[in-house]
Amino acid sequence: MTLIVTGAAGFIGSNLVKALNERGEQRIIAVDNLTRADKFKNLVDCEIDDYLDKTEFVERFRRGDFGKVRAIFHEGACSDTMETDGRYMMDNNFRYSRDVLDVCLAQNIQFLYASSAATYGGSSRFVEEREVEQPLNVYGYSKFLFDQVIRRVLPTAKSQIAGFRYFNVYGPRETHKARMASVAFHNFNQFRAEGKVKLFGEYNGYAAGEQTRDFVSVEDVVKVNLFFFDNPDKSGIFNLGSGRAQPFNDIASTVVNTLRSLNNEPALSLADQVQRGLIEYIPFPDALRGKYQCFTQADQSKLRAAGYDAPFLSVQEGVDRYVRWLFGQV
């Protein structure tokens, strides 16, 4: 049977295609928008059966042009949280998703889709409950609104619907994301270019570099998606983060030490890295005051209750692997 991956040339989508290939799956229809042509590089080492532009996909999907489809991994979206064109965002992230969902429901096709931790916005709690969801931008709202649709249709759905609220994902195949790429990616490039990593200084009661995020490796994101793919009886909306809140200092320090290791230099403590000027703290920008989340951490209770029991990579493990991969691409 055929599998479909939307956003297939993007960050998470291409990692899913590669992982499916490694399981022997090659009847994969890749759907994307290659206006940003450099994304094609993410699929060069992948095997797909066909490629479609997103503009022609939904109608052909609705007509049944692809034969028997087992599942769709719906990763296609505009993920730029700085995008201010609300009509564009809602069309890409909400309306497009609704159209794909409607076909899956009508044809009893597994529907696994990308939500986002941006649905929580200004909340200090990160649990999959309507009361704590406070999106701060139109990107977060587009994901939030689609999640509300899912909550309404879940009780009567005859096929699987599984949504994943991705936290701060990092890992291979994100180069095309440019300014929206992960902190680890930018720290890597900054250290190679300048010999140091710059982090925000003290703010809102957090010491320099100690603002925290739930950083999750794309390896774990893929594993969770595949777990639900293998368990079509499990539906719902689930947080997909490591369950740990780790400071930006951990990312920067791991990037520095991994690059030092690759240069046959010994690891240094964070204090030594700062003392040597390898990590530098800059004043917190006025433009971000009052608009910046100093803490995120996925509540994994619902994910674990669904039966996913594998451990998640820590920043030290995952970023080390990622930096070594990036170094091999240089």
Swiss-Prot record:
Its EC number is 5.1.3.20. GO terms for molecular function: ADP-glyceromanno-heptose 6-epimerase activity; NADP binding. Homopentamer. Pathway: Nucleotide-sugar biosynthesis; ADP-L-glycero-beta-D-manno-heptose biosynthesis; ADP-L-glycero-beta-D-manno-heptose from D-glycero-beta-D-manno-heptose 7-phosphate: step 4/4. It comes from the Bacteria. Belongs to the NAD(P)-dependent epimerase/dehydratase family. HldD subfamily. The gene is hldD. This is ADP-L-glycero-D-manno-heptose-6-epimerase. GO terms for biological process: ADP-L-glycero-beta-D-manno-heptose biosynthetic process; carbohydrate metabolic process. Contains a large N-terminal NADP-binding domain, and a smaller C-terminal substrate-binding domain. Its cofactor is NADP(+). It catalyses: ADP-D-glycero-beta-D-manno-heptose = ADP-L-glycero-beta-D-manno-heptose. InterPro entries: Epimerase_deHydtase (IPR001509), Heptose_epim (IPR011912), NAD(P)-bd_dom_sf (IPR036291). NADP(+) binds at residues 11-12, 32-33, 39, 54, 75-79, 92, 143, 169, 177. The active site is at Y139 (proton acceptor), K177 (proton acceptor). Substrate binds at N168, R179, H186, F200, G201, E202, Y203, R213, Y292.
